[in-house]
Amino acid sequence: MTGEDERIEMEIRKRNGESVPFQQEKIFNAMKKAFDGQGKEIGSREMDEILATVLNNLSVTVPLTVERVQDEVERTLMERGHYEVAKAYILYREKRSALRRVRHTIARTVGDDSLDEVLRRIQMDFTEEVYSLAALQMKFESFCRPGMTEDERAEALTKAAVELTTAEAPKWEFIAARLLNHSFRCRNAQEWEGRGGDLYGRLRYLTDKGLYGDYILAHYTHEEIAMAEDFLCPERDELFTYSGLDLLLKRYVIQSRSRVPLETPQEMFLGIALHLAMNEGSDRMGWVKRFYDMLSRMEVTMATPTMSNARKPYHQLSSCFVDTVPDSLDGIYRSLDNFAKVSKFGGGMGMYFGKVRAAGSTIRGFQGAAGGVIRWIRLVNDTAVAVDQLGMRQGAVAVYLDAWHRDLPEFLQLRTNNGDDRMKAHDVFPAVCYPDLFWRLAEENIDAPWHLMCPHEILTIKGYALEDYWGTEWEKRYLDCVNDPRIEKRSVTVKDIVRLVLRSAVETGTPFAFNRDSVNRMNPNGHTGMIYCSNLCTEIAQNMAPIEHISTEVHTENGDTVVVTATRPGEFVVCNLASLSLGNLPVEDEAYMERTVETAIRALDNVIDLNFYPLEYARLTNQKYRSIGLGVSGYHHMLAKRGIRWESEEHLAFTDAVFEHINYAAVKADAALAREKGRYALFEGSDWQTGAYFEKRGYTSEKWQVLAKTVAVQGMRNAYLLAVAPTSSTSILSGTSAGIDPIMKKFFLEEKKGSMLPRVAPELSMDTWWYYKAAHLIDQSWSVRAAGFRQRHIDQAQSMNLYITNDYSMRQVLRLYLEAWRAGVKTVYYVRSKALEVEDCESCSS
């Protein structure tokens, strides 16, 4: 634009009555667009002449209005013979006028003038005809009834946008989120009126009300909180889908005791960041910003307990816990008590029952006295129902039993609908620990005998616990027990067990599968222990040991009699989880991924020291191993965005490369953290230190070899690093697909509290449509093979589901289990039959 020296200083009155400085550049740009739209070229000199004429004619107009300016542009274009351009400009004005009318009508009907700006932004950002606000207006007016309050009308408007969401118009879920966010912010402003002020004032108020942990303001100065407030990016609220924002406002942000949300989404992310960076030394506010950015950009999600409880008075941040149940009355009830305390604070549980004696075993030499594991599991079931996670939902627990345990047949019928109801436990999730020998026989000689024995009898007669061994050593001792006539055996065939497993899996989705030899073979900390089982969602694989009673003594203190019970803490596993949202990350950008992984690893490491532990046993184990579990979500989202089909070799090659780099970045970041903050206590002798970790995984390239040497010198901060959780809830928050699962459908309606909510595959469009194949339509062999490629790079395990249809035969399902075992996959989570609905675990949703 030329003629800058001829700028006219005056004001223009906008349509809302507001007077603002006149900007002649806007006239120039509008005319330029009109010419460009008609494919007409115009020289800068002629454009300046037209503009000068318009400005000269406007200079005598008082007051100057938007309509007067546009009328003058039309007249000048016509006078200079640009009829087609003038016509296009007139049509453009008419279109803009229609857009304004529909905005004003909706805002007036709701009774909220501030809504107009939100609707204007929606029109700017969603320009396709399918997202016309006229359609929203029609749907909205069909919901309006006489006597509705302003809040009810605003809710009806949001509902209208939700119901316009279809497979062909998926972005309505983003429009609905903006409308929901506007309604929320209006209510939130009213709630804080006269209370808060700046962020520090709001945090002080929440702290005084007992809703915010006082440790935040104790660790940060007023100036630091003010600096943190400057980090807030409210525009990132526009990343939410309706489902994600609705879930976040209902379950994650801080609420008053009357369930009114008091925290904005961005304040929630910032509060979590403030908590996780609390103990950082140098550049603490820099880490607050990095943590906030990764969360608010939805590139990383922390586990549900961390998202919900960080910054709160009871900050239980861990997702799952795993306990080894001892074979004693005191030990079993201690484990039940541990589960109750974990459940009270919202944690899920994995419990290993492989050491508990079988039904009919001896107690203090009395034959047939033991009731077996089923009776104890029923108590676990009742505890899960009774201790209902702060009144939100009942407890969740997976119970694990070895494939050679004498109570296995009854265990495999815990959740089935037939049989004696006194032997059922419908609210627990059974899982079986399989040795290699079992799968080898299932593959090579399924009619071979399989002998079920009691662990207590083996320990009494042989002097060792069979479950304490794995691999060839386990197999040697198993055969030794089989050949010992003193040990009572319940002999069946491998086929009998396989049939029970598959029947239960197809009917109930369980038992989960834990391939114990694959797990222990790749355990980087096998030098200090044994992994008996996994957690509730089958992604955790860490050393375990039962809590042991040492003594009970009576003392006198200050004249009072005190009973002191001493226990050896064992290894009570804790899962601290987060997930990389692969669908929202540039996974090909190695530098960006390394920075993101580094930030996530640091945040998880901080969880260990900042956590509120429901049990001292958990705290001791967590501080000894400092185990974390960085996983992923948005896996199918990632593939579809890149035009990669699930059932393709390209998928396998891509996932191999992506997960190798994630692992490389994680190990590199963890070694650097060890140099800065110190290594975990049991590093010496680990596979990390000896280099066996890298050798077992075939990491022979130069960069891996350099990293292996660095690790040997600097150590590792955390004993375990990677674990892929299901992310059923937090993937909704971040608008991506769950975990490593394929999507269920491109589009479906979910019934929720009497209304139907649309669920749309992430970024569904004509570009991604053909790459989103539904889970039950996918050849599951591809899923298993992909899991095998990923497993090489994951030191723990994956929540990997199998999706089957009614057409699957038992032999086909068995073949999938065998393929998983051969591929080195450590665990199999649910078998999701198309006719079966199974509950998602919310504890591990990272």
Segments (PLM) and residue ranges:
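Core nucleic-acid recognition elements
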Residues: 2-8, 18, 44-270, 286-292
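Terminal amphipathic helices with adjacent charged low-complexity linkers/tails
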Residues: 88-95, 102, 172-203, 434, ...
